[in-house]
Amino acid sequence: MKLMIFTGLVLFAIVSLIEAQAENEKPCLPEYKVCTHVPGNCCSDLVCDCYGRYKSGAQIGRNCFCLQKGVIYKREN
């Protein structure tokens, strides 16, 4: 009986450890994906770049996207 309880606890610990590792290894976000709420999840060659949205001079929100490092984006008219 004690052996069964011990085995069950060991199996539970192993499954919990595997699930915790899987959560830490979430896939990275590819280019142009939204990263507003997860700024550290962009793939290694990308950076989470944020832009404010304004209406009548007041900020109404913020958008963040995974973009290439060192690239400057400009608005076209």
UniProtKB/Swiss-Prot annotation:
Residues 21-26 form a propeptide. One of its GO terms (molecular function) is toxin activity. InterPro entries: Spider_toxin_CSTX_knottin. Residues 1-20 form the signal peptide. GO terms for cellular component: extracellular region. Pfam families: Toxin_35 (PF10530). The keyword Translocase does not apply. It is found in: Secreted. Keywords: Disulfide bond, Secreted, Signal, Toxin. Contains 4 disulfide bonds. The keyword Secreted applies. Expressed by the venom gland. Belongs to the neurotoxin 19 (CSTX) family. 08 (U8-Lctx) subfamily. This is U8-lycotoxin-Ls1p. It comes from Lycosa singoriensis (Wolf spider).
